[in-house]
């Protein structure tokens, strides 16, 4: 570790804090329908879309209608993307001449991008045409992120309103999130990426001659535009197989900084947006403080673990001064790789600039554990906010038990109905992750896809289902996931992680919205204080992480101690 490394990390976190308030206020305004600087340009587009789709923007929906609209839109998106992938050979913009994507891989990929997971069992530059990348994947990068924002906005309204039968209009929320938040930000970031050297072209490839005189074909494509929304929407799916470690997807230290900044800023600002819309900005800052506490500790552990290096390699005579550089890009180094890995898993981004499977046991444990906590730190775009609210509901319930009062969150009483839905949502992740991992660990055909022996082999399976269930998309690279079993089961894990979580959350929103908002009294437990933030951290650790401890003990924890003892597999 070095002072420069810590300065790089600190500056990034400070830069995000600087934009949290202005970006949060902007989103609070545009998502509420207030006029803004883009209204003269995008207002007619918004109204035109409503007219073409036959949507009345003034007609709001109850939680069930909102949920059904969200599910219908997601199903339509899945079917469209699946069709594009299966018919790729006959689609335009296919200069590479790629064939149709096999059905099981097309299912996995379509589910992956519709659920904002972006798990990739393929190499983008060797499998997908420009049409599939742009009209299929990039479109879903926008609308899946907008879907997450919409759900979070519905939950936010439920706390802001009093005795309300509705929580908003899904189609309006989806449209505004796309037009006024994601699209303009993506244009700005894409232009910046082009200036930093990312390709933006319809050419398939360019042929170059290496220093050794060997001809090499270098893949090209519309990379910058996809990279921008990949990060802003916490999607994470790369244009190239090695994601942000590829020099055309992340060429410099500056582009790496912008990648991390883009993926973290919108999700963090949404927490402030929540505070603004419910009339308690301190609540938004309390949530941000919780996320920063986890991220700072997480990046510190990863940075330290990777900087220590691998003692087994040191015993073989390799210089340990640079730490564990296996799977890392020299142009980024230990600090920026550790920061990227921590942020991408604290969010639901899943993009990588280094190979997580090449981290040390302790270094690989942290990214996996952050996903298992529910990716609420600050989590995916939108999904992180409503996931944080679920844990906040559980935290005030525990606080209410301790002081003998009916728990309240922002003036709304938390009763049995909300607790049942909250616990149902929290149990989805371990059920999906541990269930599929256990089955795969004893199936010979599934174990055959594992590329590493010993505890790291179990970690590869556990990380895969953790990533899928947590809608993250990153992976330990030793697992060959492009098989019928993994394509299918990972797809179902992604569906559970997205929709089996979102439906109970929207049910909570409907129940909360119908309650009368009470004024604060002397007996009310404040939820915008350091005390509550500490309680929330404890609840996230206990309910979000403790259930995975036995599995982690058999995987990365054992691997760490095996490395220290010099044992190999």
Swiss-Prot record:
Family the UniProt entry places it in: Belongs to the KdpA family.
GO CC entries: plasma membrane
Principal subcellular localization: membrane
Superkingdom of this protein's organism: Bacteria
Membrane-spanning ranges: 11-31, 64-84, 135-155, 179-199, 258-278, 285-305, 384-404, 423-443, 490-510, 531-551
Keyword line: Cell inner membrane, Cell membrane, Ion transport, Membrane, Plasmid, Potassium, Potassium transport, Transmembrane, Transmembrane helix, Transport
InterPro entries in UniProt: KdpA (IPR004623)
Keyword Ion transport among record annotations: yes
Role noted for this protein: Part of the high-affinity ATP-driven potassium transport (or Kdp) system, which catalyzes the hydrolysis of ATP coupled with the electrogenic transport of potassium into the cytoplasm. This subunit binds the periplasmic potassium ions and delivers the ions to the membrane domain of KdpB through an intramembrane tunnel.
PANTHER family: POTASSIUM-TRANSPORTING ATPASE A CHAIN, POTASSIUM-TRANSPORTING ATPASE POTASSIUM-BINDING SUBUNIT
Name of the protein in question: Potassium-transporting ATPase potassium-binding subunit
Protein's organism: Rhizobium meliloti (strain 1021)
Membrane topology: Multi-pass membrane protein
Subcellular location as annotated: Cell inner membrane
Subunit composition and interactions: The system is composed of three essential subunits: KdpA, KdpB and KdpC.
Disulfide bonds: none
Any one GO molecular-function label of the UniProt entry: P-type potassium transmembrane transporter activity
